[in-house]
Structures are given as C-alpha cells and as structure tokens.
Design a protein with these regions (language model features):
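Bacterial N-terminal signal peptides that target proteins for export
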Residues: 1-9
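Bacterial N-terminal signal peptides
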Residues: 9-18
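Extracytoplasmic metal-acquisition and chelation regions
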Residues: 21-312
Length: 312
C-alpha cells in the first residue's frame, strides 16, 4: 500500500510540474477543450459547435475505471483551456489530478453539477455515488444544460449560440428519452432484467423501470468470485432470463462464466449483444454519438429480452 500511494503522489506531482514548466502549443485565439470520455465530448460538441476545438482522452473500448494517462494525454491536458470530466470517481485517481489543476485553468466535473439528490448511492464505498449518470437520458439532459451554463462563463460572447445549441440538443434528448421508454415497454414485465458484466446501468434501471444485475460492482476494479457467479446463474435460471450482455469496454470473461454456468444447468441463455457502457462506438459512426450509443443499446436489450425462452 505504501508503495502504491508513493507512486500515486509522484504521478500527481509530475503532472502538475509539467503544467508549470512546459510551453503551451495551441492555435492562438482558439479555445481548446479536453474531455475525458466520449460521452462528455459529444455533449460539449453539441453545445459549442464549431466555435471550439474539442478532444477526448478516452476513445472507444476504453474503460475509464482503469484508465492511465499517456504522455500524449498529458500534453492535451496541458494545452487545454478547459477540462471537462465526469467526476464521482468515474475516472478513478485521474479525477484527483484534475481537481488539483482547477487553479490553473477551468476544470468542470460534469456529473457533479447535478444536485446530490439526483444520484444513486454507491453501495461499495460509503458516501460515494454511482457515476454512470448518462444512462438516464433525462438526467443527462439536465447535466448538459448545466454544462452549457458553465461553458458560457468562459465565453459569454457566444452565450446566445451556446444556449441555442443546448436547447436544440435538449429537445433531441427529450425525444430519445421518450423513445427509450416506448421501446422498453415492449419487453414482457417478467423479463425486464438486464444482466451485464459490471453494474453500470443502475440509472438506466431507475429511469426505465428495469431490474439491473451486474456481476462486478459499479467499478470494474471490483472483484467477483465463484459465489457471485453462482448466485447470478441461479437468478437467471430461476427467472428464465433469455439474454445477458457483454460490454464493449469490459472483458467478456466474466459474462462468459455466467453463460457457461447457465448452460450447465440446462438454461440456454444467449449473449444478447455487446453494450456500450463506459465508452461509445467508433468515431464517425452513429454509435459513436451519445444518441446512437443509447439507440444501439436499447435495440439490443429489447431484442434479447423479448425472446420467449420456451420457444428455444
């Protein structure tokens, strides 16, 4: 433990030192925003349009819980005028690093702009909250609106432009929220159970009335044992759940263990698809947008859980 804490302290010190010593290399007059995740980048881009250059540190398939900054990432953070991250410990120790930079530049924890009453408690860590707020589309819309107000503080000349964009995106999210509700209602009530590798979908479950079960905890750093697998297998078999799901940013090993356990008990459950949980799809694709990511997930969830297990 001592060695890990020592390395962590050194890591923070080196990053902060690099911000103090290294020269800035960016286009003069152009605001540069660096985001941690693709979901946040998507939100920022929908607000600022082409007025600002926006980058994300974590691309498709990257698990923010396990993320480690590269030299290239540190350079981006150094050059950024504004840094936007999720907060609520989604980025792990990196969040602590970013907080220490707020006296040098504007640093925004997007999720933490919301009131605490909006959060789901993290049962693994006392006093902490579940960071996966983007799976409640309506809650994400509220976070986007609050983020827009923060960005306007840095660029009041474009206030009208930002407000217009935020309102347009909010309307799209309202439509998305209603579409998700409508699609989820197609699933038989007794099959509205979403089983995934880690517990990233609690906000989705709360918003759309779905029972959510994850083999790992809220963070992929959480470990699981044979008893966890056995208990989840028993639940799936007893409730005749037709499909379970892998995640694009999490190893399939855990869910494959559950799959084999179910089959060993005579329940032919299937992998309903790979869901976008902590990262979006490839840039330039529909799934590489927040709206596309949600649509893709819901399509797979509805398709998999609507199957009649007795017809298999």
């Amino acid at each position: 433990m001592y060695w890990s804490l020592t390395k962590y302290t050194l890591f923070i010190s080196l990053i902060i030192l690099s911000f103090s010593c290294a020269p800035q290399e960016k286009d003069e007059g152009q605001t540069y925003i660096v985001c941690t995740t693709g979901m946040i980048k998507d939100a920022v881009e929908n607000i600022v349009g082409d007025k600002v250059k926006v980058d994300a540190l974590m691309g498709p398939g990257v698990d923010p819980h396990l993320y480690k900054a590269t030299q290239g990432d540190l350079k981006k953070l150094q050059q950024a005028d504004i840094i936007v991250y999720n907060g609520l410990f989604l980025e792990g120790k990196m969040g602590d690093v970013l907080q220490k930079l707020d006296h040098k530049k504007m640093v925004i924890a997007m999720a933490e702009l919301l009131p605490k009453k909006a959060f789901i408690n993290n049962t693994e860590f006392q006093g902490a909250f579940d960071p996966h707020i983007w799976f409640d589309v309506n809650l994400w819309k509220k976070a986007v609106q609050l983020l827009s107000k923060e960005l306007i503080k840095n660029d009041s000349l474009n206030q009208s432009f930002y407000n217009q964009n935020a309102n347009k995106f909010s309307a799209q999210l309202d439509s998305l929220h209603k579409a998700v509700q409508s699609q989820i209602n197609l699933i038989p009530e007794d099959k509205k159970v979403l089983v995934t590798a880690h517990d990233a979908f609690a906000y989705f479950g709360r918003a759309y009335v779905v029972d959510v079960r994850g083999l790992q905890g809220i963070s992929t750093l959480s470990e699981f044992g044979l008893r966890d697998v056995s208990n989840l297998v028993d639940f799936i078999v007893q409730n005749e759940i037709p499909a379970i799901y892998t995640e694009t940013s999490v190893s399939e090993k855990a869910i494959n263990a559950v799959l084999e356990g179910c089959k060993s008990k005579g329940h032919d459950v299937v992998i309903g698809g790979s869901l976008y949980s902590d990262a979006m799809g490839e840039e330039g694709t529909f799934e590489g947008t927040y709206i596309g990511m949600v649509h893709s997930n819901v399509e797979k969830i509805v398709s998999g859980l609507s199957k009649n297990t007795k017809e298999k």
